[in-house]
Curated annotation (Swiss-Prot):
Record-level GO cellular component terms: cytoplasm; membrane
Subunit-structure text: Homotrimer.
Any one biological process term the GO annotation gives: cell wall organization
EC annotation from Swiss-Prot or TrEMBL: 2.7.7.23, 2.3.1.157
Gene Ontology MF annotations: glucosamine-1-phosphate N-acetyltransferase activity; magnesium ion binding; UDP-N-acetylglucosamine diphosphorylase activity
Homology family: In the N-terminal section; belongs to the N-acetylglucosamine-1-phosphate uridyltransferase family. In the C-terminal section; belongs to the transferase hexapeptide repeat family.
Residue span of region Pyrophosphorylase: 1-232
CC cofactor note: Binds 1 Mg(2+) ion per subunit.
Pathway(s) where this gene product acts: Nucleotide-sugar biosynthesis; UDP-N-acetyl-alpha-D-glucosamine biosynthesis; N-acetyl-alpha-D-glucosamine 1-phosphate from alpha-D-glucosamine 6-phosphate (route II): step 2/2; Nucleotide-sugar biosynthesis; UDP-N-acetyl-alpha-D-glucosamine biosynthesis; UDP-N-acetyl-alpha-D-glucosamine from N-acetyl-alpha-D-glucosamine 1-phosphate: step 1/1; Bacterial outer membrane biogenesis; LPS lipid A biosynthesis
Protein name in UniProt: Bifunctional protein GlmU
Chain positions covered by the region annotation Linker: 233-253
Known cofactor(s): Mg(2+)
Primary gene name: glmU
PROSITE patterns for the chain: HEXAPEP_TRANSFERASES (PS00101)
């Protein structure tokens, strides 16, 4: 395969999205639309990738650089919206001195497969001409440019409005994806004339110009694969296709999805074999789940790591958490950023953690908040325990040693330490460090008044009779 550069058109406003946000920044499975064609170009080994920006140029550039910080990006600006040919021409300066193949992609076409683009580049090499293109066959080609052939050879693209009745019967359409020789591309773009009253320049003219200089290569792709996004209905439709692809890939790799139609799994998620994922689970980008895990119904994992053999019970939420092997989490647990759990940890219903490191075999099974905490191994934290970590200005650390037992309804007022093997009685407010092997109790002594209820009722009856 020849040396490759790529131009990705990201300048459009996307008026039909009815949004203040640039169209290519609208998310599809957790990533902006434009991330998908950009990723494809990089997968193919493009040595220069030129996103052409226009509408909200700074926002688009910032987003793309954030997604691909180490990529060979060279941004180009289309100052006015004057058609696709003008947009590509905006990239000429960014590719000055380059003489290889230029792959032209659209920032709002997220479903193109790598294999299709590899076939396009191979078709370009095989044809030996100036240009190769992707075509697609549509049941209803109304509105699309038709691929006109002569003896099987591509000769030009005719827009629907300009087609003769015979040409309108053609169902092979232009998908708008091209591989073009750079030297030909820049010269041909300079020759293209505006096609309408708005002074717009269209790339489709390139095909006829290339056909006059040699054979035009072509490869056919499924219509779903080449479909763009113009409004939010189409955005949702493309997302469904992409989600199905992702879910099927996981299942073929040994992952069980109880209800593939409701499992929301973004790109950039890794799941090990023999893991079972329940209905309506969300696995966001950056999440890694080991083998033999169970992710229960309605659970949400954002950029979290779950080691082998762990069970996440239904409706638990993990955000940038690190979970060790054989943990049992939930139901209804929330692990916030900075949570790190060792092996065999149990966190039960309505337990919330934040910046908490919890050692091997420790348990907090009910109604507990553990924030800014370091908890040793083999600890038991009773129901209703709270680390009081915030004084109104600063956060403070709570430390529990190994083998600590914390009774129910305990408040640990940070900064505070409870030493190895210590016990804290139920209902205690711990404000001072507890030495190893100690018992800390701060409850008010119980007072029992026998016969008090009868005395109270008699007094109330007398008052009513008054």
């Amino acid at each position: 395969m020849s040396v490759l550069a790529a131009v990705v058109l990201c300048a459009g406003k996307g008026t039909r999205m009815k949004s203040e946000k640039a169209k290519v920044l609208h998310p599809i499975l957790g990533r902006p639309l434009c991330a998908y064609p950009l990723k494809r170009a990089l997968e193919l080994g493009a040595t220069s990738v030129v996103p052409v920006v226009g509408h909200q140029a700074e926002a688009v550039e910032k987003a793309v650089r954030g997604l691909f910080p180490d990529a060979p990006l060279r941004f180009a600006l289309q100052r006015e919206q004057r058609g696709t040919a003008d947009a590509v021409r905006s990239a000429e300066e960014a590719l000055k001195g380059y003489s290889g193949r230029v792959l032209i992609l659209y920032g709002d076409v997220p479903l193109l497969r790598r294999e299709t683009l590899e076939a396009l580049l191979a078709a370009h090499d095989q044809a030996g001409g100036k240009l190769a293109m992707v075509t697609t066959t549509l049941e209803d080609p109304t509105g699309y440019g038709r691929v006109i052939r002569d003896g099987g050879k591509v000769t030009r693209i005719v827009e629907h409005k300009d087609c003769t009745p015979e040409q309108r019967a053609v169902r092979e359409c232009n998908a708008g994806i091209y591989s073009v020789d750079a030297d030909f591309l820049w010269k041909a773009l300079a020759e293209i004339k505006p096609q309408n009253a708005q002074g717009e320049y269209y790339l489709t003219d390139l095909v006829e110009m290339a056909a006059k200089r040699g054979p035009v290569g072509s490869v056919e792709a499924d219509a779903t694969e080449t479909a763009g996004v113009n409004d939010r209905v189409e955005l949702a439709a493309r997302a469904r296709v992409l989600q199905q692809r992702i879910n099927e890939a996981h299942m073929r790799a040994g992952v069980s999805l109880q209800d593939p139609a409701t499992a929301y799994i973004e790109e950039g998620v890794t799941v090990g074999p023999d893991t079972e994922i329940g209905p309506s689970v969300t696995l966001a980008a950056g999440t890694v789940v080991g083998k033999g895990c169970t992710i229960g119904q309605g659970s949400v994992l954002h950029a979290s790591t779950v080691a082998d053999g762990t069970v996440i019970k239904p409706y638990s939420v993990l955000e940038e958490a690190r979970v060790g092997e054989r943990n049992v989490i939930g139901p209804f647990s929330r692990l916030r950023p900075g949570t790190e759990l060792a092996e065999d940890v149990h966190l039960g219903n309505f337990v919330e953690t934040k910046k908490a490191r919890i050692g091997k075999g420790s348990k907090a099974n009910h109604l507990t908040y553990l924030g800014d905490a370091v908890i040793g191994s083999g600890c038991n934290v009773g129901a209703g325990t709270i680390t009081c970590n915030y004084d109104g200005v600063n956060k403070h650390l709570t430390e529990l040693g190994d083998g600590v037992f914390i009774g129910s309804d305990t408040q640990l007022v940070a900064p505070v330490k409870v030493g190895d093997g210590s016990y804290v009685g139920a209902g205690t407010t711990v404000t001072k460090n507890v030495p190893p092997g100690s018992l800390a109790v701060s409850r008010t002594p119980q007072v029992t008044k026998e016969g008090w209820v009868a005395t109270k009722k008699a007094r109330q009856a007398k008052a009513r009779a008054g």
